[in-house]
């Protein structure tokens, strides 16, 4: 297998899942996907993903990055404040409610659980600090997402958008994300039985994300197929949004005197957004807006490609 395929199999898998599911007119793929979705398949996959993520997180390394208070605050500001604010200009464009909703879901997400840490290391940054940002951001997301998303939804001007109930969302995120993540971290520290499987957790996680996207696409296939003309505008929106977020991170790092070795974790972790949690909320709260799922998936593909170039740029920058 060529090295390029080995390195990019997840991105290729995302593209394949989207194409095969949307072109499945006989129900060969969508039938099983709909059955699994109706029988708590997504919940099981989500719990497994975050449990495995907890197994991988080496909490003993967090102390090494805990002293960088300025960098941590800068990254969290990018994740929870600046990212939602950067969606405001897009509300002035002639975008459909589904596209705006997808962008809002992306913007309120915490940082990724794995790729951001790896890319920070590849850029010459502090991986321990990136890990700290990951854990803090995903813990805070339980409380920030319901409030921020509720505010952004009020900007759509579409009365069909339901008002979300904040407490149920908090409980859902805590149950499906935070508790499995903590359980995995505890098992890692207290047991050695699963350590032989640690090298494979990243692959299993990515397979789980592909399964989540597949089940969600099965549910929203009809709505997506009927609105395929929005794909190019979505690519433009997701590219512009992530570019703006990365540039904001660079500006904050520059004026905050966060130099080389520290700025990488701020810029990369502040700009990356987890896919799986956005899929959870789209499937749970807005299944009728299938195009919102397309925004989440395309943003993930676009921002990983952009960040691969960003990693090289930051590594060579003094």
Where in this protein do the model-derived segments appear?
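Alpha-helical transmembrane segments of multi-pass small-molecule/ion transporters
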Residues: 1-318
């Amino acid at each position: 297998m060529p090295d390029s395929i080995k390195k990019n199999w997840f991105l290729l898998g995302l593209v394949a899942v989207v194409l095969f599911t949307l072109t499945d007119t006989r129900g060969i793929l969508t039938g099983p996907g709909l059955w699994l979705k109706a029988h708590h398949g997504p919940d099981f996959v989500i719990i497994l993903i975050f449990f495995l993520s907890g197994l991988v997180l080496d909490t003993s390394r967090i102390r090494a990055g805990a002293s960088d208070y300025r960098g941590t605050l800068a990254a969290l500001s990018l994740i929870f404040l600046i990212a939602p604010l950067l969606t405001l200009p897009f509300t002035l464009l002639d975008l459909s409610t589904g596209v705006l909703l997808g962008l809002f879901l992306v913007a309120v997400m915490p940082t990724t659980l794995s790729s951001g840490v790896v890319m920070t290391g590849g850029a010459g940054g502090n991986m321990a600090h990136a890990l700290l940002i990951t854990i803090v951001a995903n813990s805070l997301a339980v409380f920030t997402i319901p409030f921020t998303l509720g505010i952004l939804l009020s900007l759509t001007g579409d009365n069909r958008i339901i008002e979300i109930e904040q407490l149920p969302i908090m409980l859902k995120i805590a149950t499906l994300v935070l508790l499995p993540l903590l359980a995995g971290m505890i098992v890692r520290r207290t047991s050695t039985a699963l350590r032989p499987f640690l090298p494979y957790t990243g692959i299993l996680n990515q397979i789980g994300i592909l399964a989540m996207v597949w089940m969600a696409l099965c549910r929203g296939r009809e709505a997506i197929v009927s609105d395929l003309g929005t794909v190019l505008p979505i690519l433009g929106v997701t590219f512009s949004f992530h570019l703006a977020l990365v540039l904001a991170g660079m500006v904050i790092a520059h004026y905050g005197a966060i130099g080389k070795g520290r700025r990488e974790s701020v810029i990369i972790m502040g700009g990356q957004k987890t896919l799986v949690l956005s899929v959870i909320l789209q499937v749970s709260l807005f299944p009728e807006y299938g195009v919102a799922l397309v925004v989440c998936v395309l943003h993930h593909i676009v921002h990983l490609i952009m960040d691969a170039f960003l990693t090289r740029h930051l590594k060579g920058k003094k």
